[in-house]
Amino acid sequence: MKTSELARRDKFQFSMLLNDKRYRSYTFQFFALFILICAMAYLGKNLLENLAAAGLNISYSFLGEPSGYDINQRLIEYNSQSTHLRASIVGVLNTLLVAFLGCIAATFFGVTAGILRLSNNWIVAKLMMIYVEIFRNVPVLIWILIIHSVFLAFLPQPKAFRGENPEATMLWDAFAFTGRGFYIPKPVFNDGSLIVIFTFILSIIGVFAFRYYARQKLYSEGKLLETRWTSVGIFFIPTILIYFALGNPVTLEYPELKGFNFKGGIHARGSLISLWFALSIYTGAFIAEVVRAGIQSVDKGQSEAAGALGMRPNFIMNLVILPQALRVIVPPLISFYLNITKNSSLALAVGYMDITGTLGGITLNQTGRAIEAVLLLMLFYLVISLSISAIMNVYNRSIMLKERLICLEIIIRLFARK
């Protein structure tokens, strides 16, 4: 009798959509999604009707028309006769460049400041506190303008490098830091360069493979392999041998002062440098607080136990504290990376042409296709934001709680053998 009652109870009924907690949340989510789709369909229909009444229609054919404007900082070939589509691609690459470099630099600044803020040295800790409080409490746009103004005011112009007694000199005859930007050597790829690049990629893979092997060896046998110098050898030796064996297939083109400016090499304009530095140091102040909170979330007994076993402070921080703090640090770090990407849209304030300046600026004004341009901008930032979030969430799942067990296992195995 009880079995038949349970069977009737488990049999699906429509009333369970609201009364059963197993289905209630899905029901509400379905209705919310349905209402959202209906609202978007209504707004879209209303938009199309209004555009038709005004004699307008949504079309992306303007992307194939000549842009008619130049872009000073670009990673691919482009001129004023290129299409608006290519101009948009240049803007996309410029946005991705400053976002990628900004995430790396902000992480470095944030982790360094977060660790130093917990330093026993009173002066260092207070200096890091001042850095954090000043930079995170002033809008990023103001920092972009201040840093760009300082960049223009204090760095020499190219003419200062001219003459028998120049006011400024190049660093190692290869690097020039001017108010117009940084000039650095440019690699020139000749015959056989693909082999060198392929060897370099294999060397990187080899380093990760060796470190993975060393980690597995440590976990399974408790044997600690020397990884630092071995990794350096795997990284450099094969590439250097192939490079000289093929007769220097990759050379460098150095910047040279010709006329009123430098020619040759890679020119990173001042707008890119100032934007990148401002975004990095501003976001780094927020990351520093997250890193500090993550470190403080680890029980003090962990560091005390590691110190009692004779581990040095830098090893305690790198092998015990930080791996456990990552599970607290990484989730908010995702938001900071997204903020760097979206804050890069302020690039137009210093003349850096990102996607907002090309597609959302000049292209929009020239073609009058505001709706199409804004929709493309929204799609771009949505895709980039979701991609960053997905990648960081995968990494976050890979280090959740596991790292704590791994670190404890390493310590136990290492000192149990001694």
Stretches found by the model and what they are:
Residues 2-418:
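Transmembrane alpha-helices and adjacent helix-loop boundaries
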